[in-house]
Amino acid sequence: MPAFSQATDLSAWKELQEHHTAVGRNIVLKEAFEKDPQRFEKFSRTFKNTVDNSDILFDFSKNFLTEETLSLLVKLAKEANVEELRDAMFKGEHINFTEDRAVYHAALRNVSNEPMQVDGKSVVEDVNSVLEHMKEFSEQVRSGEWKGYTDKKIDTIINIGIGGSDLGPVMVTEALKPYGAPGMKLHFVSNIDGTHIAEALKDSNPETTLFLIASKTFTTAETTTNANSAKKWFLETAKDESHIAKHFVALSTNEAEVTKFGIDKKNMFGFESWVGGRYSVWSAIGLSVALYIGYDNFHQFLAGAQAMDKHFREAPLEQNIPAIGGLLSVWYSDFFGAQTHLVAPFDQYLHRFPAYLQQLSMESNGKAITRSGEYVKYTTGPILFGEPATNAQHSFFQLLHQGTKLIPSDFIMAAESHNPVEGGKHQRMLASNFLAQSEALMVGKTPEQVKTEGAPDNLVPHKTFLGNRPTTSILAQKITPSTLGALIAYYEHLTFTEGAVWNINSFDQWGVELGKVLAKKIQQELETSGAGAGHDASTSGLLAAFKQKANLA
């Protein structure tokens, strides 16, 4: 474990504060490029994806960086023992110390079968056994060998889960839609709001629908409630409970609850306690992905992530792409006072990517207590948000360009589209915006330029853009399964780097629990008469108002 309590105690942190005062806050990006024609080459990095022999370019040059800045950030990472914590994670050590667990999602994508152990026991065999089960099952369903209770082919998959059991599979199946099985319908149900399950069932036929119940414990309230509603809907048509075995499978480790529900234990896909929910798309939770895009493509997805793992483990920090991304985030959060981080994919298939990254980033680093149990003396996890562009340009980009907040931004694009409409015309228009936005945010527009364009004096300040807004541009060849895997792993390791420097535990989520506990108490009060007890006046008033409006009073 790191031998420091507060990141502010590290000498590199103090040096960065001095550097920020003397240099960092005075960097004018436009001038930096004018002074150094090699700036792009110096501060961009290329990830070589050995899986499909493509490259992903990460351009960090439009960030508040000098060679000294990067050197000091690397020094900070070394003093914070980022490399040691990284190596401990990849060795299967219990770096999630509040839950006494390993953090070993990398083992799920160990397609090269490198030795990987937890507590002295190899995990490779068990991981491969689950993957083999996923392969066999997904191929049976996709081929039509697996049939419903009336011998019809499955054509609809409904994944019921919440949090990591939902966000990952939703995002990945949307991102890889071009690889999806023709004619297969996918629904993801997460919300306890009955509308979510009702809308999915409305579009489904019990004879051809397969339900994936995704819950490690099989006790998550939202998931089990939705699963029981789905079972009731199914049995209204199927009648015989023995038919459940052909239409329900469990992504869980709780065999007792799974079999009690009526699912055959042979149709149970397990995973280990060292798989955190927000990292679980690589595990059996990714079964919906394998069913939709096929197991071979799912394997490519895993392989792309492993390729980024290898880079993160082996590249020196100065060249380490996820480490640089994470260190820049610390630089902006703690030295420039940035509170947010924008991720804008210039790719409609990636429209759920920001929502996925929200959980990854904010559940991991939304912490205020260091590993030594002290309250942090600095800012931790930024608020991550985003929408696909160019849509986002017509909504919140106004604030990026002319607002008062510093919002470091990531723009993501692929050179090749899966849909080269009109000979690639749409893609070229998209690319022009991808390139123009980062340039515009950097260079801005001076009052003199506005005047030259003929604007009246009273409008000049309104049409002036200060510029000097930092961005990172990420340019892939094409959004393939392996490219997507690498991109997700990039953000995982970026998030890891942030948390390691801040000396917080990025792998628990106690903040999720308190609301759940209180909700159980209030749910009981909603089922009984009276106004409930022990609440503040606001909660009591709201409870009474809800009961009245819902005719429960």
Curated annotation (Swiss-Prot):
Catalytic reaction(s) noted: alpha-D-glucose 6-phosphate = beta-D-fructose 6-phosphate
One Pfam short name: PGI
EC number: 5.3.1.9
Record bears the keyword Isomerase: yes
Residues at the catalytic site: 363 (proton donor), 394, 516
Subcellular location: Cytoplasm, Cytosol
Pathway in which this enzyme or protein is active: Carbohydrate degradation; glycolysis; D-glyceraldehyde 3-phosphate and glycerone phosphate from D-glucose: step 2/4
SUPFAM superfamilies in the cross-refs: SIS domain
Keywords: Cytoplasm, Gluconeogenesis, Glycolysis, Isomerase
GO cellular component, one term: cytosol
PROSITE patterns: P_GLUCOSE_ISOMERASE_1, P_GLUCOSE_ISOMERASE_2, P_GLUCOSE_ISOMERASE_3
Residues binding D-glucose 6-phosphate: 164-165, 215-220, 359, 363, 394, 516
Protein's UniProt keywords contain Isomerase: yes
Gene Ontology MF, one: glucose-6-phosphate isomerase activity
PANTHER family the UniProt entry points to: GLUCOSE-6-PHOSPHATE ISOMERASE
Entry function: In the cytoplasm, catalyzes the conversion of glucose-6-phosphate to fructose-6-phosphate, the second step in glycolysis, and the reverse reaction during gluconeogenesis.
Protein name as it appears in the record: Glucose-6-phosphate isomerase
Organism: Aspergillus oryzae (strain ATCC 42149 / RIB 40)
